[in-house]
């Protein structure tokens, strides 16, 4: 298993997706917050990812535990409401 995961993240606010490489043991919530900052979201939101199966990932799991693999396409979502 790789120590990192390379993903493509889309945001409803920005047309062009961005690519990120995260440690596979990073929490989903922390990775989503980093991606959110790159897309210009304010800090303090409860951001997470939704995978291509439209499953919202648990912010408290690591990316590996959430089943995130290299090349996955993820959507940035706010669990506190719409972004």
Question: What is the predicted function of each stretch?
Answer:
Residues 1-83:
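Ubiquitin system architectures
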């Amino acid at each position: 298993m790789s120590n990192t995961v390379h993903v493509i993240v889309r945001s409803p606010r920005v047309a062009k997706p961005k690519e990120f490489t995260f440690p596979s043991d990073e929490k989903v919530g922390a990775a989503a917050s980093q991606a959110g900052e790159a897309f210009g979201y304010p800090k303090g939101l409860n951001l997470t990812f939704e995978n291509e199966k439209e499953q919202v990932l648990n912010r408290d799991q690591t990316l590996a535990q959430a089943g995130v693999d290299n090349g996955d396409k993820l959507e940035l979502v706010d669990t506190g409401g719409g972004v």
